């Protein structure tokens, strides 16, 4: 029954998904349908085999999985989300680093094609888990998206090796100062301290709170008097 369901689902999706084939002459759509039909797997080895097959579908397979996500009022996404989460976990293993690029590209394309905000956020959260500095432009693209901005700034904040790029974005103020200050705190970006201190001069309450938090994490002696004044104003014992 599950296999029939996935077959009907794929029939309603993109015709290009039929094109690529594996050694068993299965199309990408068939490989994904077979994998979804076997999830959740009872044994670890079976699970690994399923993830390996999903990974083998490359960018096109990830995009197709993304297109299968539906709005919450239209159906359930548990199996597809489980598959995407599993593939991302699989390619973030040290010995699978060479397979990560296609998954990252697939997630970026899936985000762009998706029109449902919660599903876009889910896809971006998965990209965050496997992102490299090459994905920074993807996150920057959504910094001004009313719904995705929070996920985008989290992506930047948690991407390894993004310190220099983040500092440049802070200098250009490509996003609200409050969100950028949050990223500084997560990254412990000491080089951003002078900018944060300057921002405090005309910051609103939420931005002040974010800046104080960031400075408490990565600030130097240059921030001590500022933090002390803020603590006293809040009647916090210093």
Describe every region a protein language model picked out.
Residues 6-15:
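Bacterial N-terminal signal peptides
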């Amino acid at each position: 029954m599950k296999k029939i369901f996935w077959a009907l689902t794929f029939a309603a999706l993109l015709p290009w998904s039929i094109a690529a084939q594996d050694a068993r002459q299965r199309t990408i759509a068939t490989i994904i349908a077979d994998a979804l039909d076997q999830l959740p797997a009872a044994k670890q080895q079976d699970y690994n085999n399923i993830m390996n097959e999903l990974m083998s579908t490359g960018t096109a397979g990830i995009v197709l999985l993304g297109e299968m996500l539906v709005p919450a009022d239209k159906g359930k996404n548990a199996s597809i989300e489980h598959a995407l989460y599993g593939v991302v976990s699989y390619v973030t293993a040290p010995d699978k680093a060479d397979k990560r690029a296609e998954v990252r590209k697939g997630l970026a394309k899936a985000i762009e094609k998706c029109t449902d905000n919660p599903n876009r956020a889910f896809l971006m959260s998965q990209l965050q888990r496997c992102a490299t500095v090459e994905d920074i432009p993807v996150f920057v693209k959504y910094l001004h998206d009313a719904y995705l901005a929070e996920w985008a700034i989290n992506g930047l904040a948690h991407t390894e090796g993004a310190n220099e790029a983040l500092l440049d974005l802070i200098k250009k103020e490509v996003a609200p100062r409050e969100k950028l200050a949050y990223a500084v705190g997560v990254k412990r970006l000491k080089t951003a301290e002078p900018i944060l201190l300057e921002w405090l001069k005309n910051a609103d309450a939420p931005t002040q709170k974010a800046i104080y938090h960031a400075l408490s994490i990565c600030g130097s002696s240059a921030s001590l008097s500022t933090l002390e004044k803020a603590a006293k104003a809040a009647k916090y014992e210093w």
